[in-house]
Amino acid sequence: MTELIDIPFLLTKDCSADLEDRLRFCIETGSLYQTHESFKKDIGEIVNTRQALVNLKFGDSKLLTKYYGYLECLLKKIDPEALAFSWSYTNYTIFEGNVFRDENLLGERRNILFNLGIAYYQSAKHIDDYKNNLPLVCDYLKRSAGCFEILSQRTKERNSEKAIISETMLKALKSMCMGLAQETVWFKSLAAKKDLLTSKLAYKCFEYFQESLNSFQLVGQSTEYIKLILVFVESKMLYFKAVCVYRLAQSIESIADNVGVVIRCLSIAVAALTNSKLESTVVFKNKCLEMLRQLEKDNDFIYLKHVPSHLQFSDFVKLYKLDSMKDLIVLPDLTEIAPSMLDQILFRNLLPIEIMDYGTSYNEKQDIYVLQHFVEPINLLNIQLDEELASFFEIDPQHIVNAHNKTKSFVTRKELDVIGQSFGDLESNAINIETQLANITSYLDLEIKTYEEDKQQYGDVWTIVDARDVTKEFYEKVEKLRQYLEIGRNINLETQELFASIDKSLVTSRTSKAHLTAQYNDPFLNKIEALKKRRERFISEIEKKSYENRIISKLIMYYKETDDIPGTISEREEIFDNIYSKHMKVFAVDMKYIEDCKNENYGLIKEIEEYKSRTNFNNEDRSSDPRTQYIQDVRQSLASLDDVKTQLKKGTAYYQQLIEKVNELVQVIVGFLEARRNDRERLLNEISTAA
């Protein structure tokens, strides 16, 4: 299609060396237990393909399509800001200073899709036998328009993809390509020799080119290329304006009765063709001019009809319904534009660190769920029972105080000793964690020192990623864990101070718990004691169940199964949420136990109320009663002791989680150091062989 104007590609620089280094760094620092050596082939493939795109030509649409697919793979695995690519926009807009600008991974994808649109356009332009290849020409132009349409939508919808090439420019190019595609449909209709149909198809071409011209005029004549394209689009619009009215004139059956209308149509056609700069308009203009002059002469001497000079082009469009033609050009979607873009999946087995981040986030969410739906409700139910039992004891103080005012509680000196030892156990855990974190720091320091010594010895040939860069994230995690450790120690100190403030003589007895139970042998108290033990066992079991049922394996499985689906990990957050919702159904059966506990509490409280009624307890003020005051002191001490127990339990769980996180970090760093050691040995062998 030789009449098409040349539209240039966006220019880019060769960045293969920098791209390879950045990809290695991204894999080392942003993936899970993996090194760049495992993806050496994939890195080479994407670097070589990118290098081949520096000098583009019209037949490179397949190469662009392949590279576009590679970028889709990268966007699912790597932070878009981690990579940089140099691009020049001087053909489309005017810049001050440096011709080339850096773009991130999203900008790279955007520009590759833009160049793909240009490549399809250029493919249509270079088809010599236009008449016999109309479907192929039309397909290329639709694909080109489809690329610009996708870019236009992304530029409009995504603030993160603010493009140098504006949405208006993209709309202008899209409308131009659609007009050219419509032209192939119009051209094919000429063989049918149906002038009115041909006129309507020509008007559709006119509409597309008019839309394109309006958009280009909004862009402005910023560069020489834009000026040339603007002239081309305007000339095409004028050409099809002329074709439209010319074919309309041809469709009028009775020339003698409508010679004035025909003359007006030809006048509009000649005026439009006079301003068109297309070479093909010369012959057509002369033909229209010759017909116009002959009809004007015949009208002056034979027909003597009025020429409606007041009628404009838009009037003919309305009178003859030239705009009634539906859109015949349907743009393809991206999979049709670039059908082979996912033929080869790069970095298929690369697991982004974000997967682990999501897993950790969901684990924390799951822990909160277990705490809020199981642990806390049961604790609240137990507190409710304790409060009711307190009033139960006030009715009959002998349940707590004997004749000699000695405490008969269910806490022994041995139990208090165990509590005291627990503080030491927690501090031992803290010391162990502190030691592990110090060891991790030492390993990282040693790795940096080793790298610096190797770099100093071997110079530029030492191409292993800088240890100072790849260990930065590990140092940050160690510091975060130290902060968590300090928080735990502060809470332990506060709890220890609370324990020290408790009057041990009020909450301990000279006899064992078993002896007290035998002495009172209160079935009601025994019943409640057994119930609390069952609830404690349930909490232990539900916490164990939660620990053994983590979501990370399900996320990894889903990710591997759907690795060929386009899009970033963050775009799958809704799917991850659905996986989490299904995962949490494992606790659905346990919710019935909470309802059973609520019903148990209701029954026990009812029993206590009935007991109160039977005792005819006098509700007069007894605050001055020494026994009542003593009971209140006991209750306060016991409540403080319960707080200590609760905090110790939480502290144990807190340190357990902290130990798990430290162990996870140790595993990651061990894998990291192992990979670094392998890379070092490999590079030393290469240097030795080269020498």
From Swiss-Prot:
Residues 3-385 form the BRO1 domain. One of its GO terms (cellular component) is endosome. PROSITE patterns: BRO1. InterPro entries: ALIX_V_dom, BRO1_dom, BRO1_sf. Pfam families: ALIX_LYPXL_bnd, BRO1. SMART domains: BRO1. Belongs to the palA/RIM20 family. Required for the proteolytic cleavage of the transcription factor RIM101 in response to alkaline ambient pH. May act as a scaffold protein that recruits the calpain-like protease RIM13 via VPS32 to its substrate RIM101. This is pH-response regulator protein palA/RIM20.
